[in-house]
Amino acid sequence: MGVLRLLVLCTLAACCVARSPPAPPLPNAPFAPLRPLGCNDSEVLAVAGFALQNINRVQKDGYMLTLNRVHDARVHRQEDMGSLFYLMLDVLETGCHVLSRKALKDCGPRIFYETVHGQCKAMFHVNKPRRVLYLPAYNCTLRPVSKRKIHSMCPDCPHPVDLSAPSVLEAATESLAKFNSENPSKQYALVKVTKATTQWVVGPSYFVEYLIKESPCTQSQDSCSLQASDSEPVGLCQGSLIKSPGVPPQRFKKTVTVSCEFFESQDQVPGGENPADTQDAKKLPQKNTAPTSSPSITAPRGSIQHLPEQEEPEDSKGKSPEEPFPVQLDLTTNPQGDTLDVSFLYLEPEEKKLVVLPFPGKEQRSPECPGPEKQRTP
């Protein structure tokens, strides 16, 4: 029995000595958790500005967005790869069309009864030592302010109207005809109406914004505007058509106004805009510019969704409010994170990868968020 007991003890000792090697760490594990940041922090505001510049720059349609406030901000510091910011931004639509390529500082928000507001979620990569600024992904959701809110604040103010309404098209075509008649050297054709409001002044009045393109016709060719043309929009016009009581047999007297602003010409590479140029090229050294042969890699993933106005039902008391700006942005659902290849930003032999985590929710938000609004929305 003593010999048997000795054999058992020896066996246990051998098992303890011959331990298996420790398990390797999980690949792609995050270097550190997301850290909340104050929404009025100077670094956060700077990164939010860069993110919106890039979002505006990659758009082909619509109006530029400006920052109203930072709603939430987190950062993931990643050693030699710099930082990846996760931002939720409250935004306002400006009066500058994205094709104008104006500096955002020159574009103010719209007057309150034309307010279009919303939220954007964005991921933004910053590597200061390597002078890299990059927008991997974004999504935005926008809504106009409801007619009910506008009417409660200003019953006589203009309110939005359907862009396809016959009176809207009439206002656009008649104001463009006026512009063409006053500028006979070159004629322009309507591309599409982008904004329209209506108001009763001394009669029904319509105020429109619309894109125009060059027309190959002269002033004497009335049917030329119907010819097909592949030319790009060259400007944005603002027109109005005000109808007042006329002298019989005329029912209405029409007053038409128009002004047009032309876009600066944009040098395009074959196949469209070079997405590498959208990553704030002035901030990056030449060697870090992404090659033009890989536009699909460098272009940020995202879109801007336009939703109809959100009316608040009269019996909504006690009910959970509907999310006004539903925005989803998830490059991964893996809580441990996945990697995103950004080697094209560095152009070095070794691979460069960012760790991307699921976009954070409201939990563990900084007490300094949301930040202060620049403009109070209706």
From Swiss-Prot:
Glycans are attached at residues 40, 139, 289, 292. Residues 266-338, 357-378 are annotated as: Disordered. Residues 1-18 form the signal peptide. This is Fetuin-B. GO terms for biological process: binding of sperm to zona pellucida; negative regulation of endopeptidase activity; single fertilization. The gene is Fetub. The modification Phosphoserine is found at residue 316. The keyword Secreted applies. The lineage of its organism: Eukaryota, Metazoa, Chordata, Craniata, Vertebrata. The keyword Repeat applies. Belongs to the fetuin family. Residues 286-297 have a biased composition (Polar residues).
